[in-house]
């Protein structure tokens, strides 16, 4: 009986260990570079966030707008700017991906600036 408990305890620890913060999503290096650049800027209000979505059968990275007339940005995994989904002077972005908010799937917050102002 003690062996069974030992095995179960070991398996439990193994599974718990698999869910640590160290095993977070591996981001493309160009997205990591954009995060490092954001960390060098003053804290945005609201704080900067980056989301990953599946859009048109590819993973894309969405940088929400930080204020009124500043457009949000949508990048491919290679950091090619796909479009500006919203924001800007009209609030409707650049018009290149008008279906983004309706057709995106698999939302995942991949980074949030947690620095204090």
Which stretches of residues belong to each language-model region?
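Bacterial signal peptide processing site
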Residues: 20-22
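Exposed beta-strand-loop-beta-strand "reactive/processing" segments of non-cytosolic proteins
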Residues: 51-67
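C-terminal partner/receptor-binding element of secreted or periplasmic proteins
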Residues: 87-117
């Amino acid at each position: 009986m003690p062996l069974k408990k030992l095995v179960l305890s070991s398996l439990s620890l193994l599974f718990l260990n698999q869910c640590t913060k160290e095993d977070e999503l591996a981001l493309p290096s160009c997205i990591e570079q954009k995060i490092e650049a954001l960390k060098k800027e003053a804290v945005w209000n609201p704080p900067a966030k980056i989301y990953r979505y599946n859009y048109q059968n590819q993973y894309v990275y969405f940088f929400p707008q930080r204020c009124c007339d500043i457009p949000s940005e949508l990048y491919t995994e290679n950091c090619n700017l796909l479009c500006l989904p919203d924001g800007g002077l009209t609030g409707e972005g650049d018009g290149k991906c008008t279906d983004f908010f309706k057709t995106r799937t698999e939302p995942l917050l991949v980074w949030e600036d947690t620095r204090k102002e």
